[in-house]
Amino acid sequence: MTPQGARVDTVAALVFWIGAALIAYGYVGYPLLMHVLGRIRWRPTLRNEIRPRLSLLVPAYNEGHVIKAKIQNCVQLEYPKDRLEVLVASDGSTDATGAAIEDATNAGLIRGIVYPIRRGKAAVLNDLVGMASGEILVFSDASTMVESGSLRALVSNFADPRVGCVSGVYRLEISDHDGKAGAEALYWRYETFVRQSEARLGRMLGAHGALYGIRREFFSSLEVGTRNEDFLIPVTILMKGYQSVYDRRAVASEDSREMTGFSRRIGLAMGNYQQLALLLKVRGWLRNPRLLFQLLSHKVLRLLTPFLILGTFASSAYLLASPGYRIAFTAQTVFFIAALLGVNTQLRRRGGAVIAAPYYFCMVNAAGLVALRRIVRRKGLGGLHAKPGALQLVARR
């Protein structure tokens, strides 16, 4: 072998091992590290039965099939009626959502607002917060149903002055039989494990948009077009030196048919790129090294994973003459074949996690590539280039 060929082999080997190590760390090493640290350094939240004034905020867009049930769910939650207000907004819906909100408002069940044109979730949330009178703001997706005692459980965490954000549990109700929802549920069980581990340290990155609450004074106006605010809002609170925690007693569930789909994953990936663009421009990260470490490990590595996958696969293919890399290439090929088999609904249903896990992993990362392509071509970005100052992130001094 020529010296040049040896150098190419060395570079290919480095690409493989660095890529494989980062993928393994991002999806296995980091969650286990958070789990171990959470057990060692866990300081329980000081919960108590408190009843501050609470505002439950529900933005909705074309949720006509579920909005009436959502409103009934909200008004029947166990919380003193004189301490709870429910605010629901229709964001330019073209179905029966607006009419249902108007009916509920006229009946005195909620405070509602119906926008004639779509303005985006961030703009609607800004308006709802402006209308709200509660000391605690609780956000909930229109498509989710909240268990009756969840508000009381959520609010009890705010008895601890260290806590600024509390997330409830997100539960996906499996209602289809094609395996797609099963793959989504598998992912959410994994993600819940990661967030619970982070929460034991008081540093949970992101909350479940299905149900989470914050202290009112910690809400900063969102730039119109902001995506994935259920990640950005908790991070702003963490940067101010307050805790973001998890409460398994507060539960919100959603029909799996509302959640599955490749286009939805593309939208979430675009939101993740937006988060990164916003947060990495914020000053003060060096004063929050632990939070920066979590951001890099939990979020940045996830965004890099599609490229790490391609690099690892290509480098092992280049080094195919070596027995060790031949095994690695074969293992990756089998994994990708399993993912392709998962495209078939019958095989996905019968294969269980053996098919569902590779299928969902590859789907999520393929969505990340499509999302980045759209960003580069500037198609369908909405407010992807929101100004970083709009979130008013202030690092703790």
Q: What residue ranges belong to the model's regions?
A:
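N-terminal membrane-anchoring/stem segments of glycan-assembly enzymes
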Residues: 2-50
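Juxtamembrane C-terminal module of membrane proteins
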Residues: 33-53, 260, 280-292, 333-397
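Cell-envelope/extracellular polymer assembly enzymes that use nucleotide-activated donors
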Residues: 52-55, 85, 232
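Short, acidic, metal-binding catalytic loop of nucleotide-sugar glycosyltransferases
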Residues: 72-83
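A conserved acidic beta->alpha catalytic loop
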Residues: 73, 90-99, 117, 144
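Conserved donor nucleotide-binding strand/loop of the catalytic core
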Residues: 83-87, 98-131, 182-189, 193
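Short aromatic/hydrophobic "clamp" motif used to bind/position activated sugar donors
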Residues: 137
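Catalytic donor/gating beta->alpha subdomain of glycosyltransferases that bind UDP-sugars
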Residues: 158-190, 224-229, 233-296, 360, ...
